[in-house]
């Protein structure tokens, strides 16, 4: 039987900050991605540091990276890291019930005309996700706890519960449900541009999963059975995210005028 989600009220200053972020117009919303990548990098630093004295800390996943997954169909942008992860109490305390010391100071700075891009300096960069998302879920797995998921569509409260979905092994997965008027942040070119502009000095690989379509001729059997094995990895250049092939989706089977079956393949690289 699935565990009931617990509901928590945001601490008053955090609720105020979120309201300010959601209800005020800011032109440079793109800084949300810089903040979430920066947080992911910090989490990776922490597990790497712990592993220096206890290498077994990396038994739950040796590869340290950040992965970005835009999904236009679902309207989501997902940011995954294989960092230290958060326990249930970390999720509840750090993302809602205990205000960081910079929360009030940042609100005062904003109201005095400071730019939203300063949010990370006050330690509350996570909430910049609400510049472009109307709902956020944070799934996290720390070596010392089970996997939990945090969720909030703002409105003053958030939920947390044990997560029995796909196991992360270790790390954090943030899913942003993008606002209808912000879907350009699901475009590959836009994501690359932001990463290159704001996150070029991150010390871990940033992998971007993208989808491409091509047509190819196949036999009827191949249309059902064919799977692509080889990985096409390319580095766009040293500062850009790494592109990783994770397979393909098939659709739109059709026959051309010669009777040869064709299919449009959506490939994720």
Curated annotation (Swiss-Prot):
Annotated GO MF terms: ATP binding; ATP hydrolysis activity; ATP-dependent protein folding chaperone; insulin receptor binding; TPR domain binding; unfolded protein binding
Q: Which family does it belong to?
A: Belongs to the heat shock protein 90 family.
Q: Which CDD domains match?
A: HATPase_Hsp90-like
The protein's name is Heat shock protein 83
Where is the sequence biased in composition, kind Basic residues? 260-269
Q: Which SUPFAM superfamilies match?
A: ATPase domain of HSP90 chaperone/DNA topoisomerase II/histidine kinase
Taxonomy, superkingdom: Eukaryota
Source organism per UniProt = Drosophila persimilis
Q: Where in the cell is it found?
A: Cytoplasm
Q: Name one GO biological process term.
A: multivesicular body fusion to apical plasma membrane
Q: Which UniProt keywords apply?
A: ATP-binding, Chaperone, Cytoplasm, Nucleotide-binding, Stress response
Listed transmembrane segments: none
Please verify whether the record's keywords include Nucleotide-binding: yes
